[in-house]
């Protein structure tokens, strides 16, 4: 999946499901970087007022999630559970692992 397609796929899932998790987020912006080993990086910025998704990286994210684009696509499509992928070593998390639970809920909301 090309970078632009993947970015739009993330947006198409996260933005409609944002109302499901916004109450779990604080007013302090959380910044998650999805670093794909084979296809660039994406930033998800979320707090209890808004969510933004863009290509790029950030110098001090709340957490960075490292995985392949194939594994991210499988997670987005509901073919792979993000928590299981973490414990299988397919997803590495650098930073605040507990804050990534909101991100996992955001992506699961589509299913």
Regions found by a protein language model. Give the residues of each.
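Feature captures hydrophobic
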Residues: 1-111
């Amino acid at each position: 999946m090309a970078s632009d397609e993947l970015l739009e796929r993330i947006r198409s899932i996260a933005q409609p499901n944002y109302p499901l998790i916004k109450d779990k987020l604080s007013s302090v912006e959380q910044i998650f970087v999805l670093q794909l080993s084979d296809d660039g990086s994406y930033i998800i910025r979320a707090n209890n007022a808004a969510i933004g998704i863009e290509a790029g990286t950030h110098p001090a994210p709340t957490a960075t999630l490292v995985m392949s684009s194939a594994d991210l696509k499988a997670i987005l499509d509901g073919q792979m559970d993000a928590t299981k992928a973490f414990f299988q070593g397919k997803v590495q998390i650098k930073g605040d692992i507990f804050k990534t639970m909101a991100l996992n809920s955001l992506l699961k909301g589509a299913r």
